[in-house]
Amino acid sequence: MSVSFIRIDDRMIHGQTCTPWAREYPCDGLIAVNDKAAKSDVLKAAYKAASGKKTFVWTVEDFKKKAQKVLDSDTRYFLITKDPIDMRKILVEQGFKCGITKVIVGPCNDREGSTTLGNNQSITQEEAQALEDISKAGYSIEFSLLPDVSIGNWDKFKGKFGF
């Protein structure tokens, strides 16, 4: 298995990602996909320092080019994007299939135009559309900051966005 865990988290790599989730879903490394972070040496260095594991920070296009190598690897990776829109690009538009069909949504901070779903979990209409598209592609979506702290799945919240 090349990907052991799929997560959307606006902080991408931090203590919650690397410690409690790694106990639930063992991993050897992390793949963070975000165009802005991948183009910033400072952000890349910060994410790599925070993980304590082999860490890659790629653009969405980089991931597309390297997806088969990820699938062929014996290394178990967490696949993390900063937002649902990037995850939709990978799972739906690129059609990346790794055998994992559950997407965990972690912290998504309050922003202008976002709807609060729970503590530190808010999404915009555009992000909701991305989650709906991911769901329709056959993925279950759970909102969970930590393994033992879940506020529910996408079906519980999608009505707030007209789905």
Regions found by a protein language model. Give the residues of each.
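Long, hydrophobic N-terminal alpha-helical segment
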Residues: 1-56
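Glycine-rich, aromatic-bearing surface loops/beta-hairpins
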Residues: 93, 101-163
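Short coil/turn connectors at secondary-structure junctions
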Residues: 1-3, 25-28, 52-53, 73-76, ...
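Short gly/pro/ser/thr-enriched loop/turn and capping motifs at secondary-structure boundaries
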Residues: 38-40, 63-64, 86, 110-113
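Ordered, amphipathic secondary-structure segments that act as subunit-interaction surfaces
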Residues: 58-106
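Short low-complexity, flexible loop/linker segments enriched in glycine and/or proline
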Residues: 45-48, 71-72, 157-159
